[in-house]
Amino acid sequence: TQPYSVTSYRENTKGVQEAAPWTAQYSVDNGVSWTDTRPEWLTAFTASGAGGTSAQPYDATVSVQTGTDTSPHTTALQNATAKGTADTPYNLSNQTDGGPTDENTANCYVVSAPGYYSFPLVYGNALKNRSTNESAYKTGNTGSNILSNFINHTGAGISDPYIANNNGCTPAKAELVWQDVMDLVTDIKYNAGSNGGNISFKVDRFSIQQGNAVIAIKDASNNVLWSWHIWVTDENIDNVIEVTNYQNVKYNIMPVNLGWCDDDVTTYAERSCKVRFTAGDASKEVTIRQVSASITIRGNHPYYQWGRKDPLRPSNGLANTNKTWYDKNGTSSQSNPATENFSAGVTCIMNYILKPDVMQNQVSGDNAYANLWSVDNTVYTANDNPVVKTVYDPSPVGFKLPPGNVFTGFTTTGGSTSTSSEINGTWSSSSLKGWNFYTDSSKSKTIFFPASGYRYRSNGMVSNVSSDGFYWSAAPAPTPKGHYLYFSSLQVIPLSTSNYRAVGFGVRSCQE
């Protein structure tokens, strides 16, 4: 919206200035022809007035322009066969055929085609192979550093996979929390039914592209009961890459970061029209012009605080700048996530659930538990012990956070090094910076890890984009830290523990 003003008057035979009524017409062919109908993209423009000797203010408003995206990933998504219908959405928890039976659930669902989708109101991976997966939220281990029964938004232990079957959990409405592509997911609905019903949404063929969204289920008091990550991508995440670590243990790693979106350039054509103001025999022409533009983003992904299930918004991949995101009203922003003191322990985890788009600003994170991302874990050392996926794991179906030792093969020593010959890989200094790490000692295949920086806990800002990489593992370090992969162009630390749980890092999941 931009202001404009009109001054329209005439002098009568006595030299007195009088208001002269005026009208406006439009031309989109540079004045060859004129019409009383304004162009469709000019959504508000006052086309007549009574006139006056002083300027009368008005506003001209244009519609949001849809850009042209020539990305091959967008083309692939648009050309994919649509799934589901408005009446029968494709059930994302049914990996067989999208039918009504809930088979396997997760906190993240991957969408690779336009269509109508749904998912049940289930805590994370609490359903597995059509049955209750109690090991996702209960362990026989006890102790002050062990969460024996994982909790929900009320602070009570989860007693049933289906949210509505837990005391004090009554779903009432579904709502978008944020999305990083305009209209990526639309028509979000809560549908009451057995076991609490489901959430459905639409991914339109016209607006589909790689992107991320978070959808929450709320009660009648507007409390978030749980939330889920929708990752739209054409990437076949099942094309895993086998990585052998320093201990000679093999892991099948997701080919890209969780929530990854590739480089993209969106262009916006110029829009213009002439406006002719006429009062009596006099006229004047002006041009309304919206200049052409292009928006470039580099590869990007959401960030995660250790032990937490919900993604925090990405950078734009170019610098320490946020990717544009959209709230439930469609309002765009590049602001940082809000931050808040979530306290610690059970209170912290409750707040993680209740406020999925707010960062814990206390450096220690939960400051309590060793098993948030591996339910039976009791130790603070990096190892190759099996990770038992929990309801707080952010990974999609079939994937989980990797164990602490997963990245040790990225150096010849299994540990920290600043000696280039001891780094098993080559640094990419192209527009998308990062390490192409060798997957084993044969050096015949690589896996790429972008230097995508981190999100700082105290103010939510992104930092170190294109210079450093940080990737969480499921392994805690002595409270309040966690084990993670760190690298720059000159150094690789596969077992770093110097940062705190509340910092937002990337996640590279491994296959279950």
Q: Residue locations for each model-derived region?
A:
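Extracellular/luminal low-complexity segments enriched in Ser/Thr/Pro
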Residues: S194-Q210
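A short beta-strand micro-motif common to beta-rich folds, especially ectodomain repeats
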Residues: Q209-A220
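Solvent-exposed, low-complexity, repeat-rich "mucin-like" stalks and linkers
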Residues: T1-D187, I241-D281
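Mobile, glycine-rich extracellular loop/lid and propeptide segments
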Residues: I188-A192, N222-V224
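Long, low-complexity, polar/charged, intrinsically disordered or flexibly structured peripheral segments
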Residues: A60-T61, D69-T75, Y116-K189, Q290-V387
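An acidic-aromatic substrate-binding cleft motif
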Residues: T233-N322, S364-G365, N371-W373
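Short, exposed coil/turn segments at beta-strand boundaries within extracellular/luminal domains
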Residues: S221-S227, V232
